[in-house]
Amino acid sequence: MKTLLIHSDYLEFEAKEKTKIAEDADVLSGKMDECLTVFIAVEKDDESDPDAVVKNAVEEIVKTADNLKVKNVVVYPYAHLSSDLGSPATAKEILAEIEKELSGNYEVLRAPFGWYKAFKISCKGHPLSELSRKITTERKEEVKKEKIVSKFYIINGENLELTEVNDEIISKMEDKGLLALLKHELDIKEEGTEKGEPPHVKYIKEKEICDYEPSSDAGHFRWYPKGKLIRDLLSDYVYNLVVERGGMPVETPVMYDLQNNAIREHADKFGERQYRFKQGNKDLMLRFAACFGQFMMKKDMYLLPKHMPLKLYELSTYSFRYEQRGELVGLKRLRAFTMPDMHTVCIDMKQAMEAFEDQLWMGLKTGDDFKTPYAIIFRFTEDFFEENKDWFFGMAKEYKQKYGKDAILEILPGRKHYWVGKVDMAVVDSFGRPIENPTVQIDVESAERFGIVVHDGDKKVHPIILHCSPTGSVERVLCGLLENAYLNTLENKPPALPTWLTPIQARVIPVGDKHEEFALEVANKLRASGIRADFDDREDSMGKKVRNAGTDWVNYVVVIGDNEMETGKLTVTIREESELKKAKKEALTVEELIEKITSDVKDAPKRPLPLPMKCSVQPIFR
């Protein structure tokens, strides 16, 4: 913020003409004698913490007014003080707050924002009569008040006991996943738990899945054919999951105008981790979730109780978060990502709680399907929890029965966010750190902010909205899968992805030239059955071909020699059933192999292999 403070004999103004960004004002003219006139330009940096800039501006104005012994203050918006202006919506709010904060101790006259104004001023002309100040969002160190913080509990779903977390409880916890999540929540760091890059970073490069794009911003990736296939299969999986449960797919823009009050208020709640930029006279942002577009769409819908619960789903390709460069870690923390995002409109809290429970089980199902077990934490405001204890205990009991696990419960003393309740589910990586993926949140604020209403007879009701990502970002899902693959190696198992997600599900390797024709027939039969199979026709030794198949994490490696041609029984190495130093082999007919792979994949999404069938002509991407 830039300010110009003038000790004035008088300031007189008259608003002449509106601009497009003018506020509706009751006071269009005014005069104040013996005053401190404060010309103010609100800048873009002020948007990061409007409360702080208001506080700092008021302190500076009060200090100057007291030094000059004046009790009259004019607040005058004056854009010409800066070439880096903040959004009009933010400026209006900040100016109004400054007026409000000063009004208790001073007579305040505020000129309207966004009008062409005529003004006259008489400066007193003494050494302190003209002062310019740069006001920042820096928060000065305040006297620390006793702060009420969240309380954390372990909930045993068997006997429904809540045990408040303390050092003794932490030392006795046996569930490594739950312990890792709890330590993360309590910000307990242990030396030696992080050494170098997490394994998935090596895997994404080595397996030609994806890599950083050096010509883009940090945290943005290029995706190679194998990685694009995996990401598309994961996207197909979530699409099927939500559509089967009544989700209606939509698509909304990635960019939004911050002059829209609802958009800006929702964006400001997320803090500084945003891509914001100016284009022409517009202040724009890149979305960090699909909330913005879906809420604007719901605002324009004529919603009735019979439509509830109404679920809109979007795979936001992409969402953007301007994470700190030092925090960027592979697929776990990046700046552009693919987020499956469903928002459910509910007529009341009862319906919202029913939907919350359904979506909890949907999220947990994804961990079952990916074979990446979750640790979970419920978070509720104290008031909400006290009113709905029985409902929560019912979920905790069912969770214990289904998964045999306890959960963490966080109780917040009051509502700090737009939600009163949420659940987060996390996979634990090889460093013992949680990768938070699925989430469900009960939003009690956004419907009113965005003007979303349900027409219930003669009444207009602001509904409850659930935010749900059934898997978390697609990139984090893959991160969890790859970290889990590494953890398998610590248990003497070869690293692997689930067969339905592995780019090359089967590879056929002929022992010699005379076996190639038969081997090619086998590969074609596999492909005709919807299996992603390729054919290793490279002029390498048999040992190298088998090792290459292992490096590529091929699930089923088929070797064809004389015996296989004579008997029709193929020698198949099954990766998922093997040990690191001991391959599991079976003799299977082509039909038996097709049946085994089909049974392995079950009803998971299917896509063809986006690479040439012959390994000799498959390009190398890095």
From Swiss-Prot:
Any single Gene Ontology cellular-component annotation: cytoplasm
A single MF term (Gene Ontology): ATP binding
Position of the signal peptide: none
GO biological process, one term: threonyl-tRNA aminoacylation
Cofactor: binding details: Binds 1 zinc ion per subunit.
InterPro entries per the UniProt record, alphabetical: aa-tRNA-synt_IIb, aa-tRNA-synth_II, aa-tRNA-synth_II/BPL/LPL, Anticodon-bd, Anticodon-bd_dom_sf, DTD-like_sf, Thr-tRNA-ligase_IIa, Threonyl-tRNA_syn_edit_dom_arc
Gene3D superfamilies (UniProt xref): Anticodon-binding domain, Bira Bifunctional Protein, Domain 2, D-tyrosyl-tRNA(Tyr) deacylase
Top-rank taxon, per record: Archaea
Keyword Cell cycle assigned: no
Cofactors: Zn(2+)
Assigned EC number: 6.1.1.3
Family of the protein in this entry: Belongs to the class-II aminoacyl-tRNA synthetase family.
Purpose: Catalyzes the attachment of threonine to tRNA(Thr) in a two-step reaction: L-threonine is first activated by ATP to form Thr-AMP and then transferred to the acceptor end of tRNA(Thr). Also edits incorrectly charged L-seryl-tRNA(Thr).
Name of protein: Threonine--tRNA ligase
Source organism per UniProt: Methanococcus maripaludis (strain C7 / ATCC BAA-1331)
Gene that encodes it: thrS
